[in-house]
Structure formats: C-alpha cells, structure tokens
C-alpha cells in the first residue's frame, strides 16, 4: 500500500504541470529549431539573492516568448517541486528552451534559461548551471539592494567568465529605492550604471521592451562546433517512474539522435538513446539535439548510480577522437545527520526511496548505520542545514516517507600523535577520554568565512550575535551612502548550522542576509556530550560541541528530555555527561503500585513484608531492566 502511495505521489508531481503537445505542435517546434543557427543561441542564467524575484522573472520571460500563457495558474513554472512552491524558494536548477523573434533584426533566436537557486546551501546547483551558460542576469531587489548571496553568486559567475547584465527588479514597489540599488551595483560590482536595466518581474514592465533585446545583444552564443564528434556534458539527472533515469545534458559539440549508441567516459558503459528532446518547459520529444542546445536524453540506464554529474557522453566508436570535458568538482557535504524510519518495518522501501532521491541530488552522501535506540538507518551528508531540511520534506512530499532526523553535526578532524588523520561525521565515533590523553595530538573543527549584509542600525546586535557564536571579525565595510554594512567573520561551521540564519533574521528584523564559504579546519577544544539513561548512553542523541557550550546545553537537554520520558516502575535517572563527568541530572520517580489495597488495616506485619518485597523488586528491575522509550519521545526531543 505504501509503495502504491509513493508511485501516486511521484506521478501526480510529474504530471501536475505537464504540457501535452500534439504531433503537429512538436513537428512545428522541431522545424523552427532546425532553422536557427548556433550564432543565434543564447544560454543564460539568473544570478540573485533569495527572494529577489528570480522565479517571477523566469515566468515573465516564458510568458513573453510564448512558452506559457499569462495567468495565475502559471506561477513559479520552473519551480516544479512541491517543496519549492511551499517554501517559495528555488532548490533545483531547472532549464527551459524559449523561441524569441527579434523584430529589430528580423531573426529568430533560441534562448536557454537556467533558473538557479539563490541559497548558499545549493551553490553546487548554481555552479553546474553556469557551466552551460554564456551569460547571466544579475538581479537585485530595488527595495533591499545588494545582499550577501548576490555578492557570492556574482563572484562565482565572474570567475566562470559569464557576461553579466545588471537588472534591478521590483521597481513598482513603493519601498523601491532605485538610485541606492544602482549605486550599490556600481560600487560593489564595478558595473557601469548605464548598463543597468530596470524591470518589474511581477507586472512585466521593461521585460519585453528592454531585457529581452539586451539578452540578444550582450550575451555571446555557444562556441561549440557542429561538425566535431558528438560530446555532451551531463549537468543533472533525475528518476522518472515511467522512463527511468533521465539525463539533462549540454551539447558541447556535434549532434545526437534518437537511436544513437553512446558511451559514458567515466564508467565506460554503453547505451542506446531511447528518447531525447527539449524542456519547453516540460519534456518535449525531438528527433535530435545539436551543438549549443541544452536538453534531456533517456539512455535506458539501469543503475541510478551510473549517472555521474560532470560526465562526458559521446558516440560509441568515437572515444579515441573525442576529448573528455572538464567535469565538476564534487560538492563536499559539511552537515551530517542520522536518519531513521519512523516505522522500523519500512526500512527496505525507505532505502529505495532515499536512493532514488539521491539520484536527483548528487550532493547528498549516503551511508548505512545503526543505532541502539532507533534501529537501522543512514548517515546522510548535506551542504547545509536548509539542504537537510529540504531533503526530508521532499522525501515526505514525493514518496510519502517519514523519517526521524537527529541533530545536525559537522565533520571533525582527529590528528593522532603518529601523524595520521581521521575525519569523523558521527558523534558515536568520537574518541573517549583515555584515547585523547594518550594517542591524540589535536582535534579540529571546520571554520567558514561568513559574509553578512545588514542595515547600519542593526550593526551592534549582529556583532553581538557573531561574538556569542565564537565569531572573529575580519572586516567591516560601509557601503557608501546606502546605509548598508558588510561584515566578514570567521566562525565555526557548527554554530552556523545551529539556526544561525534564523537568529540573524531575528536580531536584524529580517533585513540581514548571509553567505559563507569553507576556509578549512582549526584546532579547537571540542568534547562529546551524551545523554545517559540509568547509566546507558543514548547513541542517537549524542553531539560534539565546544567545551564552552557543554554546561548550558547539558542542563537544557536533561530538563527537556525528562518531559518526554514516561514514568517507569522504577526510578529513571537522566544525566548529561561529557568526558565522563556528569554535567546535569534529572530524576523521574518510580510509578507507585498500591500493593496494600487488599490488606486489612490492622495487618501491620503483612504490610511491612509486602513493602519490603516491592522495594527489592524495583531494585532488581532497575539493575536488569531496559527503560521503555517510544519513538514519539525521540521525535519530540529532536524537534526541540
């Protein structure tokens, strides 16, 4: 029954927004596509901070190029995941082909738009998307100005030699401050004010008149050669319950047709193309894909793990004359959680669901693990805490699966006295005190450089927040007359994933923005904090943290967990322990059973005998018995 529900959820998501094209419509699209030369191709992306209007601008571009019709039903067209629509953020980069007739030149153009995420946790999606583009729209909210992730994504696009078109969005808002936004773009990115385009993605102001012509004029066409042997860069992949593994590819050189035999450069496995086509905005089957185009192919791939992002796909027999493309650097997971099925009997089906979802999000690392408290599960690695939260939501929405997720932890490095190093991602693997004293030279934790932008009036509160999270100030910049401040702090990643972004939004009244990048490991005084029930450690609840946090967190843990443990027939002692030292203790008194209820009030000796027997029985139960903790208690505590 659960498997049927899972398939229903997947199919409903897949077909909810599918555009059905007749054979006549498809033929017309293919004829138009064939008549456009590669010099009239424009592949571009949109660079922006979260909530600056990327998805809305994408909708207007699709609308003005005839891909979709205007209307409320066509909102966030490229945000195809249910979790994207609920949260109002882009998570997966999506591509769409558009046709645009330029009346100035009387020429037809083929545009490939890649709508990318803005949040730092999905930077790997952004990086892969830029590899298929010749340019990008640098989008800035007229009311908020340049934000932290605008800066980070700008430098990423700039480093990949993309032609950037500065665009100020939301000019129709009463709170819009266009001169301030222009000044920030000019001073922060050194882009000429004359090149800035002002638009309203919501109303469509200047999108058709100014922005589309600028894309044609300023963004260069792809540089591939149609007569060279076919090679394509594998940009993304996903699992379709009807087609199997689907690959999103950028055709760098040559032509590929339905029925062609292709080979993977990384695995050496050969496949026959069952179907291929363009995204318009959903899959539209075509006869072939040419140089410079971005589209999908269905290779009949049997194993999900064979779809390796950054792989080069080429024709069978042409391996010796086809140069392999530079792939992508594998994203490095920096936040790890333990994941366990809410219902232990569904481990096998949940394992299949997680494996399929990982195919669509290759930045997730996956490893089996088991817990004494929660049973069989997985150790999952993510790019950030939002990434982990989104993965859990997608699993629930797309597959109907329920997970228990432990508190996030970051990778720590152990340096031994003999020169060896070990990275641990599970608190259960943290060395005990005796090993630390004899064989360990140092313990290190990951640090990041956090870039924070905020209005000057909240500067004091934000500096205090950073210092309370062991931040070290490296730079403070006042952005001219705009009233904005840019802060740079070195900070332990462990503090950043502990809802630092939520705390920043709170102290800055929602105006602060955050971006960060990894800067390596530093020696640190870190210890493992355990929750102990009647002398037995609960492995799923252990966490590694800095010594300065231990007492505060330990007291909070013990007090909080007491709320979720039901009273037993014997006394339950809850302790928070670090380095074999008890930090905090809470006691749940034994549930009393009235063994005297049936006795006569005058039978004193019998009463004493039964009470002594009850006391001895409870003592024995405490020494040999296991405390019964239900799954709901763990879930409630982990949601704290």
From Swiss-Prot:
Transmembrane segments: none annotated. GO terms for cellular component: mitochondrial inner membrane; mitochondrial matrix. GO terms for molecular function: GTP binding; GTPase activity; mitochondrial ribosome binding. One of its GO terms (biological process) is translation. It catalyses: GTP + H2O = GDP + phosphate + H(+). Keywords: GTP-binding, Hydrolase, Membrane, Mitochondrion, Mitochondrion inner membrane, Nucleotide-binding, Protein biosynthesis, Transit peptide. SUPFAM superfamilies: EF-G C-terminal domain-like, P-loop containing nucleoside triphosphate hydrolases. GTP binds at residues 48-55, 115-119, 169-172. It is found in: Mitochondrion inner membrane. Signal peptide: none annotated. InterPro entries: EF-4 (IPR006297), EFG_III/V (IPR035647), EFG_V-like (IPR000640), EFTu-like_2 (IPR004161), G_TR_CS (IPR031157), LepA_C_sf (IPR038363), LepA_CTD (IPR013842), LepA_IV (IPR035654). Its EC number is 3.6.5.-. It holds the Pfam family EFG_C. It is a peripheral membrane protein. Residues 39-223 form the tr-type G domain. Its main location: mitochondrion. Residues 1-26 form a transit peptide. It comes from the Eukaryota. NCBIfam families: lepA, small_GTP. Promotes mitochondrial protein synthesis. May act as a fidelity factor of the translation reaction, by catalyzing a one-codon backward translocation of tRNAs on improperly translocated ribosomes. Binds to mitochondrial ribosomes in a GTP-dependent manner. Belongs to the TRAFAC class translation factor GTPase superfamily. Classic translation factor GTPase family. LepA subfamily. PANTHER family: TRANSLATION FACTOR GUF1, MITOCHONDRIAL, TRANSLATION FACTOR GUF1-RELATED. This is Translation factor GUF1, mitochondrial. It comes from Lachancea thermotolerans (strain ATCC 56472 / CBS 6340 / NRRL Y-8284) (Yeast). The lineage of its organism: Eukaryota, Fungi, Dikarya, Ascomycota, Saccharomycotina. The gene is GUF1.
């Amino acid at each position: 029954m659960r498997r049927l529900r899972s398939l229903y959820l997947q199919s409903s998501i897949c077909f909810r927004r599918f555009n059905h094209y007749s054979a006549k419509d498809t033929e017309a699209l293919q004829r138009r596509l064939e008549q456009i030369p590669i010099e009239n191709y424009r592949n571009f992306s949109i660079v922006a901070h979260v909530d600056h209007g990327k998805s809305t601008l994408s909708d207007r571009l699709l609308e003005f190029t005839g891909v979709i019709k205007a209307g409320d039903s066509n909102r966030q067209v490229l945000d195809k995941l249910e979790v994207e629509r609920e949260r109002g953020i882009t998570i997966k980069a999506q591509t769409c082909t558009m046709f645009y007739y330029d009346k100035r030149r009387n020429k037809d153009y083929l545009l490939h738009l890649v709508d990318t995420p803005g949040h730092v946790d999905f930077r790997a999606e952004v990086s892969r998307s830029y590899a298929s583009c010749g340019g990008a729209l640098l989008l800035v909210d007229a009311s908020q100005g340049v934000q932290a992730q605008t800066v980070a994504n700008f430098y990423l696009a700039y480093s990949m030699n993309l032609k950037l078109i500065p665009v100020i969005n939301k000019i129709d808002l009463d709170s819009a401050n266009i001169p301030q936004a222009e000044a920030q773009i000019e001073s922060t990115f050194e882009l000429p004010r004359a090149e800035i385009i002002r638009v309203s993605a919501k109303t469509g102001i200047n999108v058709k008149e100014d922005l589309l012509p600028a894309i044609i004029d300023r963004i260069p066409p792809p540089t591939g050669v149609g007569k060279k042997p076919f090679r394509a860069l594998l940009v993304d992949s996903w699992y379709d319950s009807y087609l199997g593994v689907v690959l999103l590819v950028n055709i760098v050189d040559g032509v590929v047709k339905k029925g062609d035999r292709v080979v993977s450069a990384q695995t050496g496995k050969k496949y026959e193309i069952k179907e291929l086509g363009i995204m318009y905005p959903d899959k539209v089957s075509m006869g072939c894909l040419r140089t410079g185009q971005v589209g999908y192919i269905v290779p009949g791939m049997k194993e999900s793990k064979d779809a390796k992002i950054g792989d080069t796909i080429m024709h069978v027999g042409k391996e010796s004359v086809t140069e392999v493309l530079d792939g992508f650097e594998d994203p490095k997971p920096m936040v790890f959680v333990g994941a366990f099925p809410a219902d232990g009997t569904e481990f096998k089906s949940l394992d299949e669901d997680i494996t399929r979802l990982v195919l669509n999000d290759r930045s997730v690392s996956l490893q089996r693990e088991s817990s004494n408290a929660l049973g069989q599960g997985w150790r999952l690695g993510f790019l950030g805490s939002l990434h982990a939260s989104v993965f859990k939501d997608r699993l629930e929405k797309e597959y109907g699966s329920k997970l228990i997720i432990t508190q996030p932890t970051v990778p720590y490095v152990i340096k031994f006295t003999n020169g060896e190093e070990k990275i641990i991602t599970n608190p259960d693997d943290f060395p005990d005190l005796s090993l630390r004293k004899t064989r360990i030279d140092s313990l290190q934790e990951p640090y990041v450089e956090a870039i924070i932008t905020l209005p000057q009036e909240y500067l004091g509160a934000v500096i205090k927040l950073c210092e309370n999270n062991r931040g070290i100030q490296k730079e403070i910049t006042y952005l001219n007359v705009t009233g904005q401040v840019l802060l740079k702090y070195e900070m332990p990643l462990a503090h950043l994933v502990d809802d630092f972004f939520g705390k920043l939004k709170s102290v800055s009244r929602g105006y602060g923005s955050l971006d960060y990048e990894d800067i390596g490991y530093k020696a640190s005084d870190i210890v493992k904090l355990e929750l102990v029930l009647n002398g037995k450690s609960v492995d799923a609840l252990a966490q590694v943290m800095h010594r300065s946090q231990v007492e505060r967190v330990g007291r909070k843990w013990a007090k909080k967990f007491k709320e979720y443990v039901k009273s037993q027939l014997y006394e339950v002692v809850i302790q928070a322990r670090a380095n074999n030292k008890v930090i905090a203790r809470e006691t749940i008194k034994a549930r009393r059973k009235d063994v005297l209820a049936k006795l006569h009030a005058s039978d004193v000796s019998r009463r004493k005998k039964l009470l002594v027997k009850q006391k001895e029985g409870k003592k024995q139960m405490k020494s040999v018995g296991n405390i019964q903790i239900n799954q709901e208690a763990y879930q409630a505590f982990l949601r704290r």
